[in-house]
């Protein structure tokens, strides 16, 4: 079984070796998420309304994913750092701690979500009509919280051991299953929007079975739940996992907060149609960001391993390669969004009126997207090198302190209406992205220079 050699392989080769399978995995994962929306939008007579309703479920789905990444992406860099230090027993303990926290939090979130699904959807901006579609979808989706969180949260530990192709395969299993099951449950069996959720849950179940089979039977370092007597000695690991994962957690939770704020403002200033517009804009963003996420996550274990092994030159080169790859990709995608926005929008809807409403919104939202690269690069470096405070601060800065206030200020105080909601994003990209990247350059590069001495 081929593994990436973090110890001796070239930096560019290692990054490509990790990022390319992860890119395929993330594109498949995107397909996993987007295919629901494509099929839902084409349900006869109710597609547009149902699509907007699924958009109302995004905040809670994002919260579930955020908890998966809190313990998964929080644990994997520490796991890699300890592997770089040749401390494998500690690395295994970190992985087992993450697995235990993922399992416990998934069960808690499922129960809370099911108990409060209706009031949460109303809080997120659901009208009485939208609620008839959103509530059935969400209730079924919540049943799959445990397999969803384990498949997402444990996959980074497969990649951190160098098995990027296996990590890709675990995602592919779920994505292909979802692609096949969606039309069966939505159209053939006539379950409509509820059928999309059933297909997703079954697909997640298949994916997690593969992940756990590999990590318990085939991988070099194997996972299991913590025993009761092991919990006290793993408390410090749990604290470190949580604190390191908090940055990504905050980014996803604040994404959810921004979605709630946007939906609330758009429902007042533009009506339910603009919630559907925002759902499509968010879907396009997810499409564009997927390869960036793959590059970040592919580079992260390489940064962490070499930082733990005290190899500053390799860390510095990995940062440079990551930056060049992300900037080149974003320049191409940004050009496509500006020049042919309708092509991307029509992936998600065939409603001509909805396409026309979405085109200006998409152009406004992505006006300064290239600045977001600076945030991605800075955050990936901070997380991979265990720089918890910086990672958390810049996660909060862009979303909580810039986007959320502007989402209310621009439409109401500046009388920009729906346009103000979409323009809040590029303003935050310029300010937050620039500050994050400059701080990374001023703190990390001097530290790497000191390590050489």
Segments and roles (model prediction):
Residues 6-38, 42-46, 59-74, 78, ...:
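N-terminal transmembrane alpha-helices
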Residues 1-19, 79-144, 190-245, 303-368, ...:
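Short alpha-helical transmembrane segments in multi-pass integral membrane proteins
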Residues 27, 31-52, 121-128, 184-191, ...:
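Helix-terminus/linker motif at the lipid-water interface of multi-pass membrane proteins
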Residues 72, 141-159, 167-178, 196-211, ...:
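Short runs within selected transmembrane alpha-helices of multi-pass transporters and secretion channels
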Residues 23, 27, 31, 35, ...:
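Generic alpha-helical transmembrane segments of integral inner-membrane proteins
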């Amino acid at each position: 079984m081929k593994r990436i050699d973090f110890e001796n392989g070239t930096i560019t080769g290692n990054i490509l070796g990790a990022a390319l399978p992860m890119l395929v995995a993330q594109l498949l994962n995107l397909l996993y998420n987007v295919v629901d929306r494509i099929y839902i939008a084409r349900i006869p007579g109710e597609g547009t309304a149902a699509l907007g309703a699924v958009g109302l479920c995004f905040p809670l789905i994002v919260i579930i994913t955020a908890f998966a990444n809190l313990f998964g992406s929080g644990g994997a860099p520490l796991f890699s750092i300890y592997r770089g230090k040749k401390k494998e027993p500690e690395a295994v303990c970190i992985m087992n701690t993450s697995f235990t926290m993922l399992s416990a939090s998934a069960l808690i979130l499922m129960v809370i979500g099911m108990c409060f699904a209706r009031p949460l959807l109303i809080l997120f901006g659901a009208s009485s009509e939208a609620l008839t579609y959103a509530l059935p979808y969400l209730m079924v989706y919540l049943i799959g919280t445990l397999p969803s969180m384990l498949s997402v949260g444990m996959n980074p530990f497969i990649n951190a051991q160098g098995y990027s192709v296996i990590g890709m395969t675990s995602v592919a299993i779920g994505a292909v299953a979802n692609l096949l099951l969606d039309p069966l449950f939505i159209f053939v069996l006539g379950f409509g929007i509820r059928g999309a959720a059933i297909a997703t849950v079954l697909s997640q179940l298949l994916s997690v079975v593969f992940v756990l089979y590999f990590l318990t039977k085939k991988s070099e370092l194997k996972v299991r739940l913590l025993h009761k007597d092991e919990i006290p000695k793993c408390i410090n690991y749990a604290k470190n996992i949580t604190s390191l994962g908090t940055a990504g957690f905050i980014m996803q939770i604040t994404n959810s907060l921004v979605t709630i704020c946007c939906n609330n403002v758009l429902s007042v200033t533009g009506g339910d149609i603009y919630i559907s517009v925002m759902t499509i804009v968010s879907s396009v963003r997810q499409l564009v960001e997927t390869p960036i996420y793959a590059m970040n996550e592919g580079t992260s274990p390489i940064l962490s391993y070499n930082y733990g092994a005290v190899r500053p030159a390799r860390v510095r080169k990995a940062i440079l390669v990551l930056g060049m790859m992300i900037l080149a990709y974003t320049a191409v995608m940004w050009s496509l969004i500006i020049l042919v926005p309708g092509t991307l929008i029509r992936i998600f809807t065939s409603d001509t009126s909805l396409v026309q409403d979405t085109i200006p919104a998409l152009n406004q939202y992505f006006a300064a997207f290239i600045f977001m690269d600076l945030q991605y690069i800075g955050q990936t470096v901070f997380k991979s090198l265990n720089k918890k405070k910086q990672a958390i601060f810049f996660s909060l800065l862009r979303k909580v302190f810039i986007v959320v206030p502007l989402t209310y200020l621009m439409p109401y105080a500046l009388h920009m209406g729906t346009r103000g909601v979409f323009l809040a994003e590029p303003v935050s990209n310029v300010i937050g992205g620039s500050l994050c990247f400059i701080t990374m350059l001023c703190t990390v590069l001097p530290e790497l220079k000191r390590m050489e001495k």
